[in-house]
UniProtKB/Swiss-Prot annotation:
Protein name according to UniProt: Glutamate--tRNA ligase 2
Main location per the UniProt record: cytoplasm
Keyword annotations: Aminoacyl-tRNA synthetase, ATP-binding, Cytoplasm, Ligase, Nucleotide-binding, Protein biosynthesis
Catalyzed chemical reaction(s): tRNA(Glu) + L-glutamate + ATP = L-glutamyl-tRNA(Glu) + AMP + diphosphate
Protein's gene: gltX2
Chain span(s) of sequence motif 'HIGH' region: 6-16
Amino acid sequence: MLRFAPSPTGDMRTEQLRIAIFNYIVAKQKEVNFIVRIEDTDKERNITGKDTEILQILEKFAITHDSVFHQSEHLNIHQTLAIRLLEEGKAFVCTCTPEAPESDKTPSRYNGKCFNVDKEELKRLKEEKIPFVIRLKKPEHDMIIHDLYKGETVTSADEVDSFVILRADATPTENFASACDDMLSGIDFIIRSEEHLDETAKQEYVKKQLGYEEETTYAHLPVILNEEGQKMDEKDDAFTVKWLFEEGYIPDAIANYLISLGNTTPTDIFTLPEAIEWFNITKLSGSPVKFNIEELRLLNRKHLEKMDDKRLSSLFGFADADIGKLAKLYINEAATINELDARIKAIFSPKDFDGKWGEQMRMLEKIIAEAPMFATFEAFESHLMKESGLSGEYFSKPLRVLLTGAEQGPELSDIYPYIKSYLLEVAS
């Protein structure tokens, strides 16, 4: 079983979406369940509504899940497992302040002050309401983790240390909650960012101390870099999926690009369902990959070009295949929904009759309003020229502005078939 485990602490990052896609693909390939676990145990950082946004984004990409739950729903289970470790002598109560463990010469290591707190002392702490945490006793041996990309990694017992598993407010730490939930859900394949590699030894140790013996396959993906070769962060436009949507990039293109990053694909243009047929998680590059917005623009253009005409028209508020075909006439100069939408809006918006060609435009507007519908542009153009007496650029330029709202663009003979039934609205 595989899982995607985001935290509702901000907008979904582009890198997180890539991880979700890979987990979903591998789950489909293995014909096992794929679950979404909202890791909301850090109450102070949670942002209301972000969990819903995450699920809505997954839905836009047709990433379906077999179940979804919030980690906070398992609070009682986490507490019970922590108490069990305490009772088995595998964990201990600690009353040290956050600063106390840092008082020795190795601030990142726990100093062992509370190793020998007994049951009587624990009873006193509860009665006197003295805050305490529960720590897992550090391992006796180094932890060895096997990763698809990093190979064998060794984490010393000192690095794992005696870490906190239950906070003073009785909520679990992220490492403890994640390990417990992975164990309870039977997660045996974990695909996530290499930023979590250092946490893996602790999470494996938790499962081991709880008696869980099932093997877990790990694939810690390299981070995504910006075009300057630095790790992407909030300063980078493409850091969040929300920004990509706002800029007019569509799910098919985004998924196509994220799957292609650091990968050799059999074809440049593909959909998520198609990728499931050939994707190989072991073939991804183990090195960081750069995000190139121009490459995404190219893919977005290609996917818009392939999109069903009527569906494309719906992105601009229509339900007419002709409007989709009209939009595709602009595909060479527009790569996003926003850019295409601007062209369509220019065609259907009221025109400016106060500009250079205003007088001629008013003349043509009146003729069009009184003219019959012509099947071809040639017949339409001939009628307008005859009735207006205009010719040359005094005819062609005002006609183009009247019909498209712009002085340049595709041939009017190509545009006309798709707007002829809207002429009274367009030419006004």
